[in-house]
């Protein structure tokens, strides 16, 4: 029997990359070029996921954004200039589309939330949100191909809480299927060790010990939850199966290993931050109609809003409205 989820988390940038293409059709709106078709595809995709996997009456939807272009990955960029380098070279319309998705989402549905904060990535939000807001009997499905999100996979039988991850090609990762696929449990430190040693091409994180034997890795994660202790014990000969060759490799890679660990570690976010940054959304058809008319997309993906009265325009609607960027 398939699970009906009452909490759905969307990695917005991750999904956006899936619906856009290099030759995206663009429409001139004022002085901006807007990827209208991609915006429509984004909401068709997310609406389809909610309809297929979400509980009809009480599904809470969480839209988690990475940073805007002007501040993207600032904290981690200070550590490594190549961090997520492959994600920065995007045309202006890409970010115009993201901003428009945020604006539409704000008025698109009740019982939904936006998180978008400078210098905070989407995967930084997931664990604290689950820790602070997911309750007994809740079922969570996270939509992201980012392995960092797998650190939150959970099957708590005592509290009847399940957290699964939809990755790609209709694959839903569970704690069990992750372990079958990768050979280890998806705990926070285990995934951090995996990415620290073997790298992560999607985030431009360089491998440090790409040929480290799997049995050595499994022993490592069974004994250590922090890379600094692992490095110290390896260099002091306390990991007895490591020969001189491996100790030299670890010594030469130690600085990069510490850097990788910082890059893959979550930011420290507490409940006060979450409450302060949370943007509660609400369905407001009049607001949506103004946006849809400006973009000429009335009826494209949202059949609820009809073009009965064009009302104001997008610029006047936005007068006085600001989106906090902490």
Regions found by a protein language model. Give the residues of each.
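Low-complexity, acidic/Ser/Thr- and charged residue-rich accessory regions of DNA metabolism proteins
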Residues: 2-4, 24, 38, 252-257, ...
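Noncatalytic, basic helical substrate-engagement surface that gates or grips nucleic-acid strands
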Residues: 2-139, 154-169, 265, 271-272, ...
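Single, functionally critical "micro-switch" positions that shape active/binding sites
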Residues: 10, 145, 212
């Amino acid at each position: 029997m398939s699970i009906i989820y009452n909490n759905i988390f969307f990695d917005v940038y991750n999904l956006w990359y899936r619906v856009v293409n290099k030759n995206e059709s663009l429409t001139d709106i004022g002085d901006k070029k807007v990827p209208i078709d991609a915006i429509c595809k984004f909401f068709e995709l997310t609406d389809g996921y909610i309809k297929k996997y979400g509980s009809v009456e009480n599904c809470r939807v969480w839209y988690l954004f990475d940073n805007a272009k002007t501040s993207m990955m600032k904290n981690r960029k200070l550590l490594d200039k190549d961090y997520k380098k492959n994600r920065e070279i995007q045309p202006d319309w890409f970010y115009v589309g993201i901003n428009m998705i945020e604006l539409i989402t704000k008025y698109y549905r009740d019982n939904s939330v936006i998180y978008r904060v400078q210098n905070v990535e989407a995967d930084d939000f997931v664990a604290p949100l689950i820790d602070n807001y997911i309750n007994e009997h809740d079922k969570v499905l996270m939509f992201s191909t980012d392995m960092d999100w797998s650190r939150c996979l959970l099957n708590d039988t005592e509290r009847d809480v399940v957290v699964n991850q939809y990755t790609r090609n209709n694959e839903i990762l569970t704690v069990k299927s992750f372990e079958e696929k990768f050979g280890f449990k998806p705990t926070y430190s285990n995934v951090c060790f995996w990415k620290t040693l073997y790298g992560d091409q999607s985030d431009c994180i360089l491998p440090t010990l790409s040929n480290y034997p799997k049995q050595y890795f499994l022993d490592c994660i069974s004994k250590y939850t922090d890379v600094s202790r692992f490095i110290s014990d390896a260099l002091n000969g306390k990991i007895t199966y490591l020969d001189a060759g491996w100790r030299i490799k670890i010594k030469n890679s130690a600085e990069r290993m510490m850097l990788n660990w910082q890059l893959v570690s979550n930011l420290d976010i507490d409940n006060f931050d979450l409450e302060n940054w949370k943007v509660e959304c609400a369905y407001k058809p009049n607001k949506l109609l103004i946006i849809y008319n400006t973009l000429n997309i009335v009826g494209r993906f949202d059949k609820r809003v009809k073009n009965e009265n064009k009302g104001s325009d997008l610029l006047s609607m936005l007068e006085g409205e600001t989106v906090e960027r902490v």
